[in-house]
Amino acid sequence: MNKIAGYVLSVAALAMATPATAQFQKPEDAVKYRQSAFTLMGNHMGRVGAMVNGRVPFDAKAAQDSTRVLALISTLPGQAFAANTESVQSKALPAIWKEQDKFKAGYDKMVAEVAKLDAAAKTGNLDAIKTAFGEVGGTCKSCHDNFRAK
């Protein structure tokens, strides 16, 4: 897991060091980038969710590993919602670009709640993780309800 976290950190650092417009040669590249980030986020949310919901035994280290990766990845997809990506076929609704302030506020809230989930996981306290996980899930649901096609 440490190799994965190191890789994600390297990618995140490179992504933050390069302006978003320079990162993507084509609008389709930006869409693939954000979809990939969201897929990874969903994977790590699923791992933590399985522990939170009792489908698998709670493993504090595994929860910490997943929330660490989740916290890093959550900061990445926002930059890939450039105006030139609106016409690329995806589940992103036009409301993202029509209500940019609302979308950005929701995205920023998600990133903040993921950071809180990561902090809760570092305590090793399952109840704290459950509470924070619910908050993250609420931000995901809100965005999916308002900005993602069914």
Where on the chain are the PLM-derived regions?
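Bacterial N-terminal signal peptides that target proteins for export
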Residues: M1-V8
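N-terminal signal peptide c-region/cleavage motif recognized by signal peptidases
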Residues: A17-P19
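Sequence context surrounding c-type heme c attachment/ligation sites in exported
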Residues: F24, E28-A60, S66-K150
